[in-house]
Protein backbone atom coordinates (compact mmCIF):
# COMPACT_ATOMS: atom_id res chain seq x y z
CA UNK A 1 0.00 0.00 0.00
CA UNK A 2 1.24 3.47 -0.85
CA UNK A 3 0.24 6.71 0.83
CA UNK A 4 0.45 10.24 -0.51
CA UNK A 5 -0.61 13.51 1.07
CA UNK A 6 -1.31 16.11 -1.60
CA UNK A 7 -1.25 19.17 0.62
CA UNK A 8 -4.89 19.97 -0.08
CA UNK A 9 -6.62 18.23 2.82
CA UNK A 10 -6.81 14.96 0.93
CA UNK A 11 -4.84 11.79 1.43
CA UNK A 12 -4.67 9.23 -1.33
CA UNK A 13 -4.06 5.59 -0.55
CA UNK A 14 -3.19 3.17 -3.31
CA UNK A 15 -3.82 -0.42 -2.35
CA UNK A 16 -2.07 -3.53 -3.61
CA UNK A 17 -4.50 -3.79 -6.53
CA UNK A 18 -3.65 -0.20 -7.55
CA UNK A 19 -7.08 1.06 -6.50
CA UNK A 20 -6.99 4.64 -5.31
CA UNK A 21 -8.91 5.73 -2.23
CA UNK A 22 -9.23 9.30 -1.03
CA UNK A 23 -9.76 10.34 2.57
CA UNK A 24 -10.30 13.84 3.85
CA UNK A 25 -7.57 15.02 6.18
CA UNK A 26 -10.08 17.19 7.98
CA UNK A 27 -12.05 14.11 9.05
CA UNK A 28 -8.88 12.99 10.88
CA UNK A 29 -8.97 9.47 9.53
CA UNK A 30 -5.98 7.70 11.02
CA UNK A 31 -3.49 6.08 8.68
CA UNK A 32 -2.71 2.93 10.60
CA UNK A 33 -0.01 0.98 8.84
CA UNK A 34 1.85 -1.77 10.70
CA UNK A 35 0.28 -0.47 13.89
CA UNK A 36 1.89 2.95 13.59
CA UNK A 37 0.58 6.39 12.74
CA UNK A 38 2.12 7.60 9.52
CA UNK A 39 3.62 11.07 9.65
CA UNK A 40 4.18 13.30 6.65
CA UNK A 41 6.44 16.28 6.04
CA UNK A 42 3.29 18.37 6.37
CA UNK A 43 0.27 17.69 8.59
CA UNK A 44 -0.08 14.34 10.29
CA UNK A 45 -2.93 12.17 11.44
CA UNK A 46 -3.49 12.31 15.17
CA UNK A 47 -4.20 9.53 17.62
CA UNK A 48 -7.33 11.34 18.78
CA UNK A 49 -9.08 10.19 15.61
CA UNK A 50 -12.43 8.71 16.56
CA UNK A 51 -12.77 4.96 16.94
CA UNK A 52 -15.51 5.08 14.32
CA UNK A 53 -13.13 6.51 11.74
CA UNK A 54 -10.41 4.05 12.74
CA UNK A 55 -12.85 1.18 12.31
CA UNK A 56 -13.91 2.47 8.91
CA UNK A 57 -10.29 2.76 7.82
CA UNK A 58 -9.40 -0.70 9.10
CA UNK A 59 -12.42 -2.23 7.37
CA UNK A 60 -11.62 -0.47 4.11
CA UNK A 61 -8.07 -1.78 4.00
CA UNK A 62 -8.41 -5.03 5.90
CA UNK A 63 -6.15 -3.94 8.75
Tell where the protein language model's regions lie, with residue ranges.
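Terminal leader/tail segments of proteins
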Residues: 1-63
Amino acid sequence: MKIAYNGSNCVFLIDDEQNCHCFSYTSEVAAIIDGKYVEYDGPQFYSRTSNKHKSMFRAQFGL
